[in-house]
Design a protein with these regions (language model features):
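Feature captures the catalytic ectodomains and active-site-proximal regions of enzymes
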Residues: 1-274
């Protein structure tokens, strides 16, 4: 489903700028999320004002009743099913699944030369990245597995590293060593903007430098196969203030309505130049 969404969005590359591709991706998932939660009648106008109205009519059409809507809805349903399965969460929680995932990725993807580890890269950013790079003739591979983070916080990942007070840089070093990669980078752009502008989805989407998010991946992928991985994603929530972005414990609150429950899913993909 991620691959199909990427292919459909990249087909709009001729009429959308990179920023518009990002807005289109967020809008697709938000619209589908509102529809799935039966919140579209009450919240649809705000979505149009904040995001949809900034896109050309052909893009708006496929987001509201076309392929992007259908694909976004399918992805949301699949994620809801995974994270609502208590047995799955209990199986993963507290166990060092990074080692298993890295072994599986190595078997499935083969040689990986570079690693870009993102803090809080969520599904909208990963799909935007994949679509934009596909337009630029990069090959995108979505593996059959993903990293499940039951608490939606960095510490679930860092606690699996056998180092006292491990950091994300330690996680990056472990991944590079395990995969025998040449080099890698840690990109904190999305997490920084969640904590600075997450109080308002419109402000968040304006201030995330999607160019910076993609640039690190693109520079490595020009040289060789590059693994893209994140520690967790983020949720999109709604309360009296409007739509906002959060992850982890801050997302557990009875005063809001959950529109997108993405913080527990860490997207993974491999990128290389054709």
């Amino acid at each position: 489903m991620m691959k199909k969404f990427t292919e459909r969005l990249s087909a709009l590359g001729g009429i959308l700028s990179l920023r518009q591709m990002y807005i289109a991706t967020i809008s697709s998932f938000l619209y589908a999320g509102l529809a799935r939660r039966s919140l579209l009648p009450s919240h649809g106008r705000l979505l149009r004002a904040q995001l949809l109205n900034h896109l050309p009519p052909p893009a708006r059409a496929t987001i509201t009743h076309g392929q992007l809507y259908e694909l976004a809805l399918s992805i949301i349903k699949a994620i809801d099913k995974v994270i609502s399965d208590k047995k799955t969460i209990e199986l993963v929680e507290g166990k060092a699944d990074i080692e298993f995932i890295l072994k599986t990725l190595s078997q499935e993807l083969g040689s990986i030369e570079y690693v870009v580890l993102y803090d809080c890269l969520s599904i909208p950013e990963s799909i935007t990245m994949a679509s934009f790079l596909q337009v630029k003739n990069f090959e995108i591979i979505f593996p059959s597995i993903h990293l499940l983070n039951p608490i939606g916080l960095t510490r679930f990942i860092t606690k699996q590293i056998p180092i006292t007070k491990a950091t994300m840089r330690d996680v990056l070093k472990v991944i590079i060593t395990s995969l025998r990669a040449k080099d890698g980078s840690l990109i904190r752009e999305v997490d920084q903007k969640v904590h600075s502008y997450g109080f308002d989805l419109g402000e968040f989407s304006k201030n995330v430098s999607i160019e910076r998010v993609i640039s690190a991946c693109e520079q490595y992928a020009k040289k060789g196969s590059t693994l893209i991985v994140s520690d967790h994603g983020y949720d999109v929530l709604y309360d009296a203030r409007g739509f906002y972005v959060s992850h982890g414990l801050a997302s557990v609150c009875k005063t809001h309505q959950t529109v997108l429950n993405f913080s527990k899913i860490s997207p993974i993909m491999m990128v290389f130049k054709r």
